[in-house]
Amino acid sequence: VLPDLDDLLSDAHVVALPMRVRFRGITVREALVLRGPAGWTEFSPFVEYDDAEAAAWLRAAVDFGWATHEPAADSVPVNATVPAIAPDGVADLLARYPGCTTAKVKVAEPGTTIDDDVARVAEVRRVLGPSAAVRVDANGLWSVDSAAEALERLAPFDLQYAEQPCRTVPELAELRQRIAGLGVPIAADESVRKASDPLAVARAGAADVLVVKAQPLGGITAARAVVADAGLPCVVSSALDTSVGLGMGAFLAAEAMSPGYAAGLGTAAMFTSDVSAAALLPVDGRVPVRRVEVDRDLLERNAASPERAAWWLARLERVHALLAG
């Protein structure tokens, strides 16, 4: 049931969290955190998303803030996330993820080359050692030809999978056939979370692994249903959420994630400040499955400008009207 707009707005705060390194082209992550009867929750669709796409994110916020969810485990394993940085920054960056034995490495970033990607992945493999799991994420930026060429060069680093190497489901299916002999599984992320039909990629035989995110799929309950219907291994990941949204992801991961994989929920390490003093940071390679209590002084310290706050509150109002129909 959709709460009244007044209920959503009664304890709602817009924050702008500074990031240690540029990620997804941004250096500040804006989010709206709000308090429901079940606890703090989050609404943080990326600013470029339209209201129709943002609607799932509001459903997720309501699902987590207005419904009770029991933790299915005490903690979940998480991966380190390596942005498109130079190899000499890799060791310091990985040190922010103590105990993590899986790393996700961003590749195909605009302005970088495949040589840059190879050097970065090689350094991650060197620092973490031969037994660690290394995955790459291209965010759909390669063509089929570029992806095939890049993955041929990256395959010797023993990749756990390549996440969203190409943008469309037909491209993923074509690439998967073409590189079948390489031993690099394909994972789908954008093809799940940005699709009107998140299971199309599974039916098309276009992926070996699904990456699922709580907010874009409409919340824990909706995402769990996608996982159950997919029939593929699933990895739960963050949408660069604050620690509040990471808590939502951790609840989902504890319930729905395939064993043997680490969740992409260690991303609080990418912020210089968060909404809670007890941020959901990785310890011994894991994050706890718990609701995060927000600190009022951090809400104040990280408050977005009045203009940005007004923009987010207007967006919340429009998306609420869309869901209220």
Range-by-range predicted roles:
Residues 13, 39-43, 74-83, 101-105, ...:
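Hydrophobic faces of well-ordered beta-strands that scaffold small-molecule active sites
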Residues 6, 47-73:
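Active-site- and interface-proximal helix/loop "cap" or "latch" segments in soluble metabolic
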Residues 17-26, 74-90, 106-110, 137-144, ...:
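Active-site mouth loops of central-metabolism enzymes
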Residues 110-253, 272-275, 280:
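Catalytic core of soluble alpha/beta enzymes
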Residues 1-13, 17-31, 40-45, 66-67, ...:
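Flexible C-terminal active-site loop/helix
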Residues 65-68, 80-96, 110, 118-123:
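Short, charged beta->alpha transition segments
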